Amino acid sequence: MTAPILNTHNKEEYAPAHTAEHLLNQTMGRMFGCERSRNAHIERKKSKINWILPACPTPEQIAEIEQRMNELIAADLPVRFEFVDREHIPAGVKLDKLPEDASEMLRMVWIGDYDVCPCIGTHVASTKEIGSFHINSTSWTPLGTGGGSFRIVFKTE
């Protein structure tokens, strides 16, 4: 059996914030029905992610995002990965964010039964290792389509 050909990874992420990005994308999708973000900047000191939404979340919804994130972290969900060929990708997983030259064998990352997506980044072993999640700020930029771009700036500690 020959070894699978995999894409290389050319950047170093801060694993707690990067894993929190996965949880946050899934939380936003569940709360607002939006797609995973296509624009994220993840760092140790602060991270920011944008989503396209039909309306700006209320202060109560923003507080709920932070609360849900900290509940998921406290739940100590296991984080695992597995290499899967494209023919065996779990149902519902979208591959449209992958680069054109992505290999046929993909590294899938599972966070408990809460989230699964292809990713070659670094992650913690369980959500408890993230520590805590704090929203530093949010912003809303209206778009001509009637919705807008919602940004969350966050920190993990």
Question: What do the predicted segments below correspond to?
Answer:
Residues 1-157:
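Active-/binding-site microenvironments in catalytic and ligand-binding cores
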